[in-house]
Amino acid sequence: RALLEQIAQKQAAADFQVTGGTRLLLSSIQDDRSNPLNHFANMGTLFDHEDADGLGYRLFVGEELSMLNKLHPELTSRKGQNLLLTGRDQGRVRTTTAFVVMSLLYESLRLQESAAHPLITLFDFGVDTGSGDLLNQMVRTLPEGTIRRYGMPDVLDGIDTLLQEKNSGFRQFVVIFGLNRARRLLVQPDIYSVAPKNKLIELLQTGPENGMNFIVWANSVESFMENYNETLGSFEHRLVSDIQDDQYSIFTYAPAPGSMKPKNAIYFNMDNTENPKIRLYEKPSDDWTGRFIRNMEHALAEKQSTEKNKPNDTEWW
């Protein structure tokens, strides 16, 4: 690992412009010194060597399989700016989802977003994976109100809450882990004034331009296409992996790539003409995870305290 870190450090320091040769691919985020999340876990500070000046939220989920590693999906407040995840391996997708959540938290610090409202709403329909679950650790440990979680029985209440908040002006992200497991969304419309599924479809289609982006794991391609086919255009970002070869064209508008390994994914962006491969990060060590969460807990608590004690500009003295 020490050798990998030395090589990664040299690559990060160099202006890596080459016409041939190879680049070391790092499966673990803790080996990548150029990754802002790794820097934050080690130092507890924002990475000051990056050229990030946009207002979008970058997602650090893996490394591009190319000579340059500058590919990071970026969610903005624009129509269609949702991210769709595919894959049948819950553990692997859950690790990727955890990195999405870590990225959103980090970017909220970089962009100095207000902590007055939950940044992330998590609809967690995953099977319990035990105490080492990264998402569970963040929900339990981070300051109250950072991540708001709904389980299977609460999904309809959560959707109604989001509809009420859609025009509130708050920047927020909604993570749906295991969309096709939420059977309550498919209840027949005659029981409700508006079918629950249609409420979610409205949010997916109109949320992003109102500052509400969705990250959705479609754990069943067949069920997703049967029930939510009309929302596919609302996912202009897609991380596609671990599906049948004849299904890739549905999500990437291209044939299945050759030699797809389990840890690799195709990144589809509606604005790009190519579909690059990404090697998704593996689950980090418990030590790395603990350091990241502790540093994030401290940073968010300090941010909340600062905002709470900030003078009200409308007060008269």
Regions found by a protein language model. Give the residues of each.
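Conserved P-loop NTPase
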Residues: 1-30, 248-310
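Long, low-complexity segments enriched in small/aliphatic residues
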Residues: 8-60
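P-loop NTPase catalytic phosphate-binding loop
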Residues: 40-253, 257-260, 270-274, 287, ...
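Long, low-complexity, intrinsically disordered segments
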Residues: 309-317
